[in-house]
Amino acid sequence: MYNNNRLAKSSPEPSKAIQENTTSPHWCEPVQNGFRTFRIEDSFQTGMTAPFPHDTMEKKAREVTIVSYVGVLRSDEGIIGFSDSRCSYQNDGVCQYVADDVKKVFKGTDFIIATYGANVVYGEDQKPERLEKVLDRILTGFSGTHRDFFEKLQVTMRAHFSSHLNDQFHFLIGFRDYDGLFGTEECRVSRLGVEYSGPSYESGYRTGGYQHFGPKDLIIPFNLSVERMRKLAEVIVDSTERMGNLCLDYNPVGGKVQIEVLS
């Protein structure tokens, strides 16, 4: 259940479907860090506190996936958003390298977002533009909560969704509420609107994208300092990349480590 005193007053209560859909086949057993796992597909998992209700989009929407590795860490001391910088397309299980300079972590006044999944936006002229440019443009001079931000993003992308009906844009969020408390949340932006997992104020972490070699059931002490979380994020991405290099002919995780801090 949302705490309206902590989140923006303009933010809606979660839909009844989100609150009550605890029997979805996408649910897994709770994990030690207090979050549950929502299966986007067998190869891509992300920790969530509630399932998204709209998972009946056509299968072809997932035949081509933009592979990333991103995450957020949360303690009572602050939030760390992190990611690699590699962009790869996966089609029928085969990865194709695109670039090692893709920005995936962004910071607003009171929130950090990390994005994975689709990262190309088509405007009214149907010319492609990197998602990072759209996000940076909206963030310039933006004042408001993360939910205000995503509502604005969805409106901005209406032209895209009118011609790309099945595209989904995924985000991990770390935020500071009106009481100064730190929380995490996830959302998905699609033609159906903006869907939220529901906020959590527990110390812990969320990751998204290609997670086969990432940490599982990582424990984040409630008093872990921001500096230590920053170093931990660097270790997480570095070790994930190293293990992938050992095991895979092509590693979809790579490039420079990106980190943003909210404290």
Over which residues does each language-model region extend?
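Basic polycationic patches enriched in arginine
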Residues: 6, 36-39, 62
